[in-house]
Amino acid sequence: MKIELYIAQLLYRYQCVTVPGLGAFLTEIQSAQVNESLNFFSPPKKRIAFNANLKNNDGLLANHIALAEKTSYEYAVSAIQYEVFNWKKALEENEVLPLKNIGELRLNADKNIVFTPYDQTN
């Protein structure tokens, strides 16, 4: 199951999407920017950050998956746990973990998760 697709969907509607056992993706709206000297305008956009300290299941992601997949909440929780297990394994093997329409996760030298958001998706 590609839970990153569900995370991306939820990030359009909510400021915080917690992935139990991994961390939380947080959004912040960045105002439009005007640079008069360059005649440049950039529209408002959402910026995505990641907090590895927020790991408890708040139910948002699991409920969303259960509704979308027409399955039980318990099955959705177990699917998330399985995916998180695989993600952590990939990170520990020094892999970059791309999450479609969200960004990339990797471990730094101190084994902390580092998140790099994709800028092309608003």
Model segments located where?
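Cytosolic/nucleoplasmic/matrix-facing N-terminal domains/tails
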Residues: 1-122
